[in-house]
Amino acid sequence: MRLDLKDIIHVPGASKDFQFQLDLSQLEFYGSHPISRPVEAAGTVTNHAGALELTGTARSLLDLACDRCGKEFSREKAVPLDCLLADELEDEENDEIVLLEGSEVDLDELVTTAFVLAMDTKNLCSEDCKGLCAKCGADLNLGPCGCRPEVDPRLAVL
């Protein structure tokens, strides 16, 4: 979605709201496609004395697999959108400033980038997930598996 800001660029105090859905189901993360539902983005662009500030949130329900036990689960992911918009950059190294294309901002690109950068590298069904037994593969969240714990031969004399 491209948002045209020509009606607020030169009007301090003016703002423009946006709300849209974005399909990111084609994005692959570590061999899976967790964003199977549309991402809902909503926010506001406000002109603060000539500086355009975009604030908002992008959210979706992710379909994930636990990295410890393999159990599939769903979790809502909400990503804050917060950046400044400018028609030209003075400092190329500032990642918080998004360049306008004419008087428009590409919200699809902005939301996609924010969502990709906010994705977790490790997904757990719960913080205290015990995972699977390394010997028999039993789910340790359901109870002990019955395997005898191996003693490290280097520590057996202790």
Language model regions located:
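Structured interface patches
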Residues: M1-V157
